[in-house]
Amino acid sequence: MSTLRAAMTQTANAYEAMPARIEDLHTLSEQLDDIRAANLDHHAQLIIHAANAGARIIGLGELFPAPYFALGRDAMWHALAEDACTGPSTTQMCALAARHRVVIVAPIYERCGRTNGRLNTAVVIDADGSVLGKFRKAHIPRGTNEQGSFDESFYYGPANESYNAPSDKVLGLNPLLPVFQTSVGRIGVSICYDRHFPHVAEGLAHAGAQLILSPAVTFGAKSQRMWEIEFECDAARHNVFIGGSNRMGVESPWNQPYFGASHFVGPNGRCTNLSDHPNLVMADLDLGSLGAPDPSGWNLQRDRNPGIDR
């Protein structure tokens, strides 16, 4: 498949009965399954819309089954973590992938069955509904900007050991930066904060990625200023397509605005958004063009000087 129609979601928490005050979040402790179900149903409709529009791969947003809860510390949200292979989110996404013959990259809140640890994880599901593997967020942020604070380290830790079973569908020598041989191409994933670390895109490209999906929940002036620049630079340097998906709008009760601006970019610039839906972006990616000579005359892999690498 040379030209791949790809889509990503750009949305926010779909559960309508959120409290108006942060102090009242505790009232949701018995509604966590309802929150997940509302977001699964919302994203199912977006997946169906994208598939009907011809998308063959659909990337969902970071922690898509829930509001972005890491704006504060509240252990209540720990109960949303689920098994990456058998939990309700992956189960429903696998069924949708098989039914609509699409690849789905589904970022969830994972509880590891082996270690009982919690992680921020993207599950990669092929178009037959099978789970090819997962990517676990490698870099976990905490900090404050001019708009608010975030502390993801309270909710999950970084990937720090091999976690995919050996498979000819999982490519690359670095087990923390897997690339997946899907039915539509070689797909890599980086999650939000990972995009700021140069070795992530480089490692995924070196492992053969043709498309890197980068789901995020991001806000703040610097993040917004760098959002497009980082992806454009990485796509040009590493000769890959990149899809950056951000939340859009606000989520009660935190009311932190997310700037959206989700888009696809390739080695030669931004890709046209073909979507007619405000919560989706979609583009046709010419994967075959990645093997053609760069029109700029660049050949960074050939001309790299290994003598100055650390």
Model-derived regions: residue spans:
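Short glycine/proline- and charge-enriched loop/turn segments
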Residues: 25-26, 72-80, 149-153
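Beta-strand-turn-beta hairpins that frame and shape the catalytic cleft
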Residues: 1-8, 13-15, 179-188
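Short beta-strand scaffold segments in enzyme catalytic cores
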Residues: 106-108, 121-124, 178-180, 262-264, ...
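A generic structural motif
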Residues: 12, 138, 276-278
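CN hydrolase (nitrilase-like) catalytic-core segments centered on the catalytic cysteine
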Residues: 84-105, 186, 191-281
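Active-site catalytic loop in hydrolytic enzyme cores
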Residues: 113-207, 220-230, 291-302
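A solvent-exposed, charged loop/short amphipathic helix patch at secondary-structure junctions
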Residues: 17-35
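Cys-nucleophile CN-hydrolase/nitrilase-fold catalytic domain and related Cys-dependent amidase chemistry
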Residues: 33-137, 142-143, 218-233, 237-240
